[in-house]
């Protein structure tokens, strides 16, 4: 049975965050607000939980979720190399609406799906999300919608779509900004813009002066899922990830 907490009330927020942390650690699904849309989350290091999350959304392993972190230090532990601009971009834009795609550390014991060795990371600018993430550690988070449906900007919309598949709903009120996160791929020789979003290219170029636009770049209404394409750098071949589909790459 699902439980919902109104995080606009301080006592309910404390209870809700505690319940969400307990649920995530037990391999259950949670819904939490972010600075873009509501996300459905699972412990990134419990493969069965990630599989359950994808099933709740009605999608397969070919569209792996991104990972949200509560601190920049947590992100550094998940990647093989931050690259030439990774740390500078993190310092300037996190927490915030910038999703960065890195080569994942080969030592990680997780299974997010068909990532081809990459991971899309973001640190959201939302106090409730950060309260949860600082206790759970990295969460696999996708927009809290069924595939093909609009990404929810309220807890009501998320609950209408996901129902009892989720153990804990954290209601933080309407999301402040429904514009999806900008997605930047740092796995190649130079940063590549995969999706235009809340942070403009001009702002990004104040930190990383050389940014290429992906040839298939398209806007996406759903800020929540990262879909890599073949060939991937770790398999030889070009250093690019696929552009967003209508379901969108991620960052919630």
Which stretches of residues belong to each language-model region?
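Active-site-adjacent structural elements in enzyme catalytic cores
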Residues: 1-252
């Amino acid at each position: 049975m699902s439980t919902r907490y109104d995080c606009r009330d301080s006592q309910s927020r404390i209870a809700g965050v505690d319940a969400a942390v307990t649920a995530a650690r037990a391999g259950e699904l949670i819904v939490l607000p972010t600075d873009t849309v509501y996300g459905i989350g699972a412990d990134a290091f419990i493969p069965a939980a990630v599989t359950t999350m994808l099933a709740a959304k009605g999608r397969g392993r070919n569209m792996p979720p991104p990972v949200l972190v509560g601190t920049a230090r947590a992100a550094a532990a998940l990647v093989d190399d931050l690259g030439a601009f990774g740390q500078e971009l993190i310092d300037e834009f996190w927490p915030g609406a910038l999703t960065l795609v890195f080569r994942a550390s080969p030592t990680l014991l997780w299974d997010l799906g068909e990532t081809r060795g990459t991971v899309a990371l973001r640190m959201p600018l939302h106090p409730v999300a950060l309260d949860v993430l600082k206790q759970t550690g990295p969460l696999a988070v996708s927009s809290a919608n069924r595939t093909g449906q609009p990404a929810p900007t309220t807890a009501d919309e998320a609950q209408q779509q996901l129902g009892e598949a989720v153990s804990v709903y954290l209601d933080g009120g309407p999301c402040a900004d429904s514009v999806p996160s900008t997605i930047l791929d740092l796995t190649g020789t130079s940063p590549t813009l995969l999706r235009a979003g809340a942070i403009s290219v001009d702002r990004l170029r104040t930190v990383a002066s050389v940014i290429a636009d992906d040839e298939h770049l398209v806007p996406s209404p759903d800020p929540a899922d990262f879909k890599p394409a073949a060939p991937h750098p770790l398999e030889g071949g070009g250093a690019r990830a696929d552009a967003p589909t209508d379901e969108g790459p991620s960052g919630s």
